[in-house]
Amino acid sequence: MKFYNREKELNYLKTYCQLDPNSILFVYGPKSSGKSTVMRRVIKELEDSNIVFFYYNLRKYATYSKEEFLRVFFEKSEKKYLLNKLELNLGVFKFGVEENFDFNNLKLNDVFAKINESINAVVEDGKKPVLIIDELQKLKNIYFNGGKSLLNELFNLFVSLTKMEHLCHVICLTSDTLFIEEIYQSSTLENTSKYYLIDWLRKGTIRNILKEEGFSEEEINYCLDYLSLPYEIVDLIENKKLGLSVEETIRQWINIEKDKIKYLIDTTDLDEEELYKVLSKFKDKIKISYEKEVKKEEMKYFKFLIKNEILFYDVINGIIKPTSVKKWYAIREILK
């Protein structure tokens, strides 16, 4: 997919990667807002620098077990770190372990020792290590010997690598905002983390893209009320080439989103009336304040809609809104 203008986000992340490590960075935002695309662009633009990127895209795998985690993160080799064969075009690395390393009888301390060895090897080579994990929350339900949570222990390791030893940047990407809320409230990560939002595309950016792609001023003005995510622009451009007007494409989007929301509500055991009551808060405005407009007894309905990606909870700024502008229009139509 074509990379669209994200200079502000690119500059922030490129600069962050070149600073001395001092915190864990959580990059969050609505689903499909372009987090992974921006991060991959950062890696490409810094490929000639002295940075060694360890990049793990966990969205490629449906479920995770202890064994799968080890297979994804490590590779047997004489080297302490080596190119990731699954991401050769990106030039990123994996942690290396010796050929006779026994994956079947591992303790968590053994795993962390190998991660530390790889990172220290990069530093000894005069380079800067940056560890990036995309959709980190997929590791939530993995436990090692003694019932230790992999994710909780990883956070302790990340704090050590960044805040304490200043050895390695750790950047975690996620669209799971309930997961971000857990992290934000965690005492373990207090004063050790930064949060960066990659949100909807700005209207000026959308206008420039559509103009560059040959859309008329009338078409652009119509689209600006509905577009917010990069993939929507791609879909709009493709559909125009296939003979669909922008009005037809956008109407299709809203109808599909409306049906998805209705089906979700129709098939849950939660109180239908209460769910619609929560959605009605968005009838006349696209975002609400969590502090001022969400009651305690409504939280389970909000969490259900957030978990199912109808709503997006920006925990850092205390805002709840639909995951996209087209989703907002679908909500409003359902409420008619």
From Swiss-Prot:
Binding site for ATP: 29-36
InterPro entries linked to this entry: AAA+_ATPase, Archaeal_ATPase_domain, ATPase_dom, MJ1010-like_2nd, P-loop_NTPase, WH-like_DNA-bd_sf
UniProt GO molecular function: ATP binding; ATP hydrolysis activity
Keyword entries, A-Z: ATP-binding, Nucleotide-binding
Pfam families named in the record: ATPase_2 (PF01637), MJ1010-like_2nd (PF21690)
Annotated family: Belongs to the archaeal ATPase family.
Protein name per UniProt: Uncharacterized ATP-binding protein MJ0625
Gene source species: Methanocaldococcus jannaschii (strain ATCC 43067 / DSM 2661 / JAL-1 / JCM 10045 / NBRC 100440) (Methanococcus jannaschii)
